[in-house]
Amino acid sequence: MNSFLEYPILGSGDSGTCSARAYPSDHGITTFQSCAVSANSCGGDDRFLVGRGVQISSPHHHHHHHHHHHPQTATYQTSGNLGISYSHSSCGPSYGAQNFSAPYGPYGLNQEADVSGGYPPCAPAVYSGNLSTPMVQHHHHHQGYAGGTVGSPQYIHHSYGQEQQTLALATYNNSLSPLHASHQEACRSPASETSSPAQTFDWMKVKRNPPKTGKVGEYGYVGQPNAVRTNFTTKQLTELEKEFHFNKYLTRARRVEIAASLQLNETQVKIWFQNRRMKQKKREKEGLLPISPATPPGSDEKTEESSEKSSPSPSAPSPASSTSDTLTTSH
């Protein structure tokens, strides 16, 4: 990050000229070079002050009428009120310290700044620019002295790093301003919707009787715990009651046969017989019906199965004949 400080002084006539000089700045502490400002020549103990008693001196001076580059080192610090004084033994008119207050704003380290300006010889300098309050480090300065008539020149120092940063932030904010506006509108819209009474949709309502999802079989809904209740017709109920009167328990073959004859499925017939048996027991407990002889469950089924599988058995003696036989033997 080597930078050079250029001080070209262009003079005319009898007035001495100072060759254009470029000095590299020290990277540890930013350097500021000085050039003898006089009406006749550049030489001797040349110095000028920047800030509160901070002296910037140039120990070596070289008089050349051609452009040369000589490295020199000088340090400077800045303060709120910048005072600049020029002193030279051979300077014709006596120039006192030009004290003034220049507003400046600090900018961060490692920022580059371009410096350009014009200085005629032995003239009061006007300083305006931005310098950091502590020591400014690692800056590229390109400074020049341009000769002309003795007047009020200006030494301009611009902090391009800070300006670019502020410009970038400004453009960034400007570019994002419509986005922020749209985002704020989007944020406000849900609030306005929530403030209004909420709309109730059909899917939000609680269904007390949800629709049946069971597959419709040949005889209605099958295989679901919440199956639709079967509405039996009068003919179906009559046939089921007749069968229940003779057989409280059905075999699977008989159940299939009844289901086919009544256009019902096997499950419906089975459930109807289960419910009918529970109803029968309930009535017997209440005393509405006489208690039927207790038959173990499945006895009728076993008898039916045995009757279906076995061949017809020989006729058994009737109870009347058996009693008559016993009476005759007793006599």
UniProtKB/Swiss-Prot annotation:
Q: Which family does it belong to?
A: Belongs to the Antp homeobox family. Labial subfamily.
GO cellular component terms? Answer: nucleoplasm
Keyword Nucleus attributed: yes
Q: Subunit structure, briefly?
A: Interacts with OGT (via TPR repeats domain); the interaction takes place mainly in the nucleus. Forms a DNA-binding heterodimer with transcription factor PBX1.
PANTHER family, from UniProt?
Answer: HOMEOBOX PROTEIN HOX-A1, HOMEOBOX PROTEIN ROUGH-RELATED
- Compositional bias, Basic and acidic residues, is annotated for 299-308
GO molecular-function term, one example from the UniProt record: DNA-binding transcription factor activity, RNA polymerase II-specific
GO process terms (BP): anatomical structure formation involved in morphogenesis; anatomical structure morphogenesis; anterior/posterior pattern specification; cellular response to ethanol; cellular response to retinoic acid; central nervous system neuron differentiation; facial nerve structural organization; facial nucleus development
DNA-binding region extent: 225-284
A Pfam entry, by short name: Homeodomain
State the UniProt keywords alphabetically.
Answer: Developmental protein, DNA-binding, Glycoprotein, Homeobox, Nucleus, Transcription, Transcription regulation
Give the protein's biological function: Sequence-specific transcription factor. Regulates multiple developmental processes including brainstem, inner and outer ear, abducens nerve and cardiovascular development and morphogenesis as well as cognition and behavior. Also part of a developmental regulatory system that provides cells with specific positional identities on the anterior-posterior axis. Acts on the anterior body structures. Seems to act in the maintenance and/or generation of hindbrain segments. Activates transcription in the presence of PBX1A and PKNOX1. The homeobox domain presumably directs sequence-specific DNA binding. The N-terminal portion of ERA-1-993 may be involved in interactions with one or more other regulatory proteins. Such an interaction could regulate either the DNA-binding activity or the transcriptional regulatory activity of ERA-1-993.
Q: Which residues are glycosylated?
A: 149
Compositional bias (Low complexity): 309-331
Annotated protein name in UniProt:
Homeobox protein Hox-A1
Q: Region annotation Interaction with OGT: residue ranges? A: 71-199
Q: Where in the cell is it found?
A: Nucleus
Top-level division of the source organism's lineage? Eukaryota
What does the record say about induction? By retinoic acid.
Please note every region of biased composition (Basic residues). 59-71
Annotated region (Disordered) at: 57-79, 279-331
Q: Which CDD domains match?
A: homeodomain
What PTM annotation applies here? Glycosylated by OGT.
Q: Where is this motif: Antp-type hexapeptide?
A: 200-205
